[in-house]
């Protein structure tokens, strides 16, 4: 497929909201033993559950390495397409393409540079060259032309849009030293506006407490629909998360979007702090150059890290009393969707959650 020397804005394409209609969803099969415990077997079961839940609402493609293709095909339901593709890890939200659409129904991919969430400064593993090719390969599978930004680092989990000209992100991530230190905040805004066709960017300060991706916005904030947003929250003022969420709430409550609307902010309480157990820590291979999983480390658990499908919402369950409160809140926010919970601790142990391991392809 073509690599286009232009931009989404010049060509009349925009990034749609995740709540708009999808043609399908991509997931990468987990396997690396220095990130997923017990050879990724528990995580693979969780990924199967997520893929199966989403496949009730839209077509799902799972890509797996050559060494895991047969295993993935065996474990996944027949209606889920499985395709062989090299990768370094299973975070397609971040390594995959950001799709844009135009008014004629055409779809293109934006292929950002990927450097493992910080490159040689504070990246989570090395090398990452296979992951940096994932976006192009998915565009090829989908027969979609792409824009390639080889000199601009961005992960899909660091942005959320309303599809009507507004993007929300965090300074903690986009202004981090390991992403685009050669660019000013204003220059980063210019790139985002040009390639996603935006009019306004709302900057939150920080993401979820101890988020190892430098505070990805998709773990603390999501767009329900234009003008209506969901925010991770805690009522415990002694929790470090409280200060962060309160700061986000104050920013969002005093902002307007590209259309001049005040934002309607809905709070969804996070679970009680979830810590890595001794057994979970010992199940991860220790490898130099990758982030260790230590007993007692707090995980960045949030119900906001959910996936919005066609007529469905798939959200993480943590075995916490707030699981059911989150389910009820999501039902209220998405009255026309079926809300499905999936046990997601094994995904959380790897450093993210359901939104992080999925990437939607818009219908156009």
From Swiss-Prot:
InterPro entries: Agmatine_deiminase, Peptidyl-Arg-deiminase_porph. It catalyses: agmatine + H2O = N-carbamoylputrescine + NH4(+). The keyword Ribosomal protein does not apply. Keywords: Hydrolase. The active site is at 356 (amidino-cysteine intermediate). Transmembrane segments: none annotated. Belongs to the agmatine deiminase family. This is Putative agmatine deiminase 1. It comes from Listeria monocytogenes serotype 4b (strain F2365).
